Design a protein with these regions (language model features):
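Short aromatic-rich membrane-water interface segments that cap or initiate transmembrane helices
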Residues: 18, 69, 185-210, 268-278
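Juxtamembrane helix-loop transition segments at the membrane interface in multi-pass membrane proteins
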Residues: 50-52, 123, 306, 353
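Short juxtamembrane and helix-loop transition motifs at transmembrane-helix boundaries
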Residues: 59-68, 123, 199-207, 264-272, ...
């Protein structure tokens, strides 16, 4: 809105500031931070007055967080508001990529809110039916994938080269095309086209198959990252801290993809218009840092599924839009480890239970719970259980585990960016 207003002001002093992505991103980030801190305090007081708080804290199911029963939840509403307001004010609302991010926020925000509402007000600890969540994630994935396929505004320049001519750097771009090219790390040519996998289908059909694969992959990425973030949200400040770091890395990657100079330097696809994601992700990071003011240990509010599902979806969709989805296993390494730990633990336990052994890989999952669980706690609930990797007997404090996980995410985020130059 403000962006459009400044465009109308034309050549008035200061009006051209709004044409700079860096300026709008900084303003959006600061606005998100301030709104999150201010609204967080107001929201916490409101939830306490309405007695809207965590109620599902069973000592057998969640022995660590029994003391947190009564802490206000659904704080993800604050994060969403602190993201949307700066974006609506500072963003170019006609940009297709920004519109997709706003749709992502609203769809997953509604899904998460419905889940939290059922848990809090209906007393149903299962929350929203799992199939409804999956249906929502599939729908979002289809919207994103099909928009990237059919919107005339979604194009890319697969190659950008530069040379010096009369002491001036001249950039030459390949024709704007729709493409299923993506960036893959650790190879000489960073660009890989999904359509090439289906070359055996012929020149025409391989592109159709490539787009079908891309849409399916988009659905998978949306579901996987949003669920990974949801699993990571188990300690005070954990999900918000990790996601803020990932958000900063995505700001860098989006800026590179939307800037012709840096696209040439890093030899990645130039995606016109994707620089608008820098504004959105800046408000995303600002909102999360502001939320940490209240969510850091000891938490005064929880984000709930309203926050975690939305956060994960935003990360996944942003990566898909800038064609950096293959950097997500590294960038979101913590989310990946949390998800894999739950899947492996569940399958191994079921498999061994049928054979009368009752075996676990870790003491408890998601993985962050392993480091604050003692063998005594495991054996108290399951006396015959064996743990393959019990780890050290000394337990770690919640705040220390969060710090360690955030440091790991910081290292992984730096490595993900560095892969653009490692070939």
């Amino acid at each position: 809105m403000i962006y459009e207003l400044f465009n109308l002001l034309g050549d008035l002093p200061g009006a051209r500031l709004m044409t700079y992505i860096s300026f709008r991103a900084i303003v959006a980030g600061v606005m998100g931070l301030c709104i999150s801190i201010w609204a967080g305090n107001w929201f916490i007081q409101l939830l306490r007055r309405k007695n809207i708080s965590e109620t599902q804290r069973d000592e057998k199911i969640d022995p660590f967080n029994v003391a947190k029963k009564g802490v206000p939840t659904m704080g993800g509403v604050v994060i969403i508001a602190a993201m949307l307001i700066p974006c609506l004010l500072m963003g170019k609302l006609s940009n297709v990529y920004l519109i997709l991010m706003l749709i992502t926020t609203l769809i997953l925000g509604c899904l998460g809110f419905a889940d939290d509402y059922i848990k809090t007000f209906k007393g149903n600890k299962e929350g929203l039916n799992g199939w409804i969540k999956i249906a929502g994630q599939i729908t979002l994935g289809l919207i994103v994938g099909l928009t990237l396929r059919y919107s005339p505004e979604v194009v890319m320049n697969e190659r950008v080269t530069s040379h010096i001519e009369n002491n001036i750097t001249v950039f030459e771009k390949s024709p704007e095309v729709k493409s299923t090219r993506t960036t893959i790390p650790f190879v000489k040519d960073h660009n890989f086209n999904y359509a090439d996998v289906f070359s055996f289908l012929g020149e025409t059909n391989k592109y159709k198959a490539g787009w079908i694969f891309f849409v399916i992959l988009t659905i998978f990425v949306v579901a996987a990252v949003s669920n990974g973030a949801n699993l990571n949200d188990g300690m005070d400040g954990m999900c918000a801290g990790n996601s803020a770091i990932i958000g900063v890395a995505l700001i860098v990657l989006a800026y590179i993809s939307g800037n012709v100079v840096f696209s040439d330097y890093f030899d990645v696809m130039y995606i016109p218009g994707s620089e608008e994601l820098v504004v959105f992700m800046a408000s995303f990071v600002g909102a999360l840092i502001g939320f940490l003011w209240w969510n850091g240990f000891p938490a005064q509010v929880f984000m709930g599924d309203t926050g975690s599902l939305t956060i994960g979806g935003i990360i996944g969709v942003c990566a898909v839009i800038i064609h950096k989805e293959w950097l997500l296993p590294m960038l979101c390494g913590i989310f990946l480890m949390e998800s894999i730990s739950v899947i492996l633990q569940t399958q191994v336990y079921k498999f061994t239970k049928k054979r009368g052994m009752r075996m676990r890989i870790w003491k408890r999952t998601p993985l962050h719970d392993h480091y604050r669980t003692s063998m005594e706690q495991v054996l108290r609930n399951d006396p015959t259980c064996k743990v393959l990797f019990p780890g050290k007997s000394a337990l770690q404090h919640e705040s220390k585990i969060v710090l360690h996980f955030c440091i790991i995410t910081l290292i992984l985020a730096a490595l993900a960016i560095l892969t653009l130059k490692i070939r």
